[in-house]
């Protein structure tokens, strides 16, 4: 389906996230993973469940239940006793999610068929622009874009893990709530085209000045693939 990633073996995933694969008794032949989720309710046949400890909910609590939904593995930061699925143990599951997404995009690029990543950042208008881009690009080929405003170190990888061999365009919304965040996101998913919208004062508290914000936004341009294209807002003194 359109929501699947590039198919990967558990060994390949463990290598991509630099994790330790604990097969346990659950390893029957070599299951192939075709999707990855952090929300246990979205798990389907062939999914990898990435357990993330949030403020209210710890994904590790759900690891024993995802096997019944068809999960082929769980990525965890500690071994779960009654997991029922193979586990890939890593130090940080959020970083592992990013590493898996990065590997998925590299796998897609390695096919050599046309594939373009459009990265969008700015304080104002990201989601509207993303929705317009998706509407336009969908006429030209299968397009993956975030649902809602998935633009952080969890949302961007989850969106990127919906890219597969059929995908022609990935619209990647990149939030910038602190200096270095966009550089981190572009290291996971280097854009071919970077769009920098208005740099507003929405996040001045954390950044300190419009110049600092502009610097953060410029990280998306430095994160471009070689020969990439940047689209700037000529009306914004902090961008152009």
Walk through the language-model features, giving the residues of each.
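Short, basic phosphate-binding NTP loop
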Residues: 7-119, 128-139, 154, 161
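Short, Lys/Arg-enriched N-terminal segments with co-localized hydrophobic residues
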Residues: 1-5
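Phosphate-binding loop of NTP-binding sites
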Residues: 96-234, 238
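Bulky hydrophobic/aromatic packing residues
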Residues: 8, 67, 169, 239-240
């Amino acid at each position: 389906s359109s929501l699947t990633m590039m198919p990967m073996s558990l060994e390949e995933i463990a290598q991509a996230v630099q994790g330790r694969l604990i097969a346990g008794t659950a390893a029957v032949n070599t299951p192939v993973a075709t999707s990855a989720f952090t929300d246990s309710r979205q798990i389907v046949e062939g999914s990898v469940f990435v357990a993330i400890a949030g403020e209210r909910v710890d994904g590790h609590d759900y690891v024993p239940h995802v096997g019944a939904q068809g999960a082929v593995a769980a990525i965890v930061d500690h071994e779960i006793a009654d997991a029922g699925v193979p586990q890939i143990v890593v130090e940080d599951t959020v970083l592992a999610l990013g590493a898996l997404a990065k590997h998925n995009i590299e796998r897609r690029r390695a096919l050599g068929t046309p594939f373009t990543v459009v990265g969008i950042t700015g304080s104002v208008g990201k989601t509207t622009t993303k929705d317009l881009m998706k509407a336009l690009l969908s006429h030209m080929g299968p397009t993956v874009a975030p649902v809602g405003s998935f633009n952080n170190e969890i949302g961007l990888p989850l969106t990127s893990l919906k890219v597969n061999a059929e995908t022609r365009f990935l619209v990647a919304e990149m939030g910038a709530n602190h200096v270095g965040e966009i550089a981190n996101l572009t290291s996971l998913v280097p854009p071919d085209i970077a769009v920098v919208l208005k740099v507003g004062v929405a996040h001045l508290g954390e950044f300190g000045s419009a110049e600092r914000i502009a610097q953060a936004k410029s990280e998306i341009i430095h994160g471009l693939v070689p020969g990439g294209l940047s689209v700037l807002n000529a009306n914004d003194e902090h961008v152009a």
